[in-house]
């Protein structure tokens, strides 16, 4: 294993450890640990992307931008008690737009008819959830509506990529749906919803990023080394 790939794998291990610590903090109601671990998710995923890409591309830039917006949603929302929900919605709305733009070329190249057909109902799920949450959204309704459209678009485009992007997009959709129920439909919230929201969000986010990295034509460890030559052996 090359040194850069070792670092890449170590970053995935660090991400998994941060997620496990965060979920443990939620279960134990350890507020300080929760606040420390959540802002670590996006920077670790950014480092995963940076250690994988052999050169800067449109897709990698969009992935990093999306992760920066996700970091803002994870971090800044918790610092603003009054407007935390709005900051989170707008930050993740921007992240979803970036991810959709990154997924669109992949969807055009490798779309799988079966996965796309299975993803079509996502629009209905998002519309139904939006209608149910509309009354509780209050003044945030326009932002929630824009987020719902971006979420459905990202989930649909993720289905046309590969298995990891599809699973990641689906879990992201599930996480956002449960969070919306928590915020705007308190009576419909499920037990331990906060824990389930973070489990589906962190795994979905990781799979979405991993799927887009996997779809890159080359990674740093698979690119040809400088000066490498093609040798043809004839019998």
Give short role names for the model-derived ranges.
Residues 1-235:
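Polytopic alpha-helical membrane-helix bundles and their juxtamembrane interface segments
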């Amino acid at each position: 294993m090359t040194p850069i790939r070792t670092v890449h794998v170590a970053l995935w291990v660090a991400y998994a450890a941060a997620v496990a610590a965060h979920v443990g903090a939620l279960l134990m109601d350890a507020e300080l640990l929760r606040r420390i671990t959540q802002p670590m998710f996006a920077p670790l995923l950014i480092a995963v992307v940076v250690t994988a890409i052999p050169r800067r591309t449109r897709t990698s830039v969009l992935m990093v931008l999306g992760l920066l917006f996700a970091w803002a949603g994870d971090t800044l929302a918790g610092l603003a008690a009054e407007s935390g929900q709005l900051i989170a919605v707008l930050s993740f709305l921007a992240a979803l737009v970036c991810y959709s733009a990154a997924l669109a070329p992949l969807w055009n190249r490798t779309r799988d008819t079966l996965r796309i057909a299975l993803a079509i109902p996502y629009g209905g799920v998002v519309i139904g959830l939006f209608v149910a949450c509309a009354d509780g959204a209050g003044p945030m309704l326009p932002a929630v509506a824009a987020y719902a459209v971006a979420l459905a678009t990202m989930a649909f485009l993720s289905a046309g990529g590969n298995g990891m992007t599809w699973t990641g997009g689906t879990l992201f959709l599930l996480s956002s749906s449960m969070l919306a129920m928590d915020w705007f439909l308190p009576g419909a919230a499920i037990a331990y919803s906060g824990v389930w929201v973070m489990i589906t969000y962190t795994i979905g986010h990781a799979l979405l990023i991993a799927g887009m990295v996997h779809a890159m034509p080359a990674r740093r460890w698979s690119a040809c080394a400088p000066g490498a030559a093609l040798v043809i052996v004839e019998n």
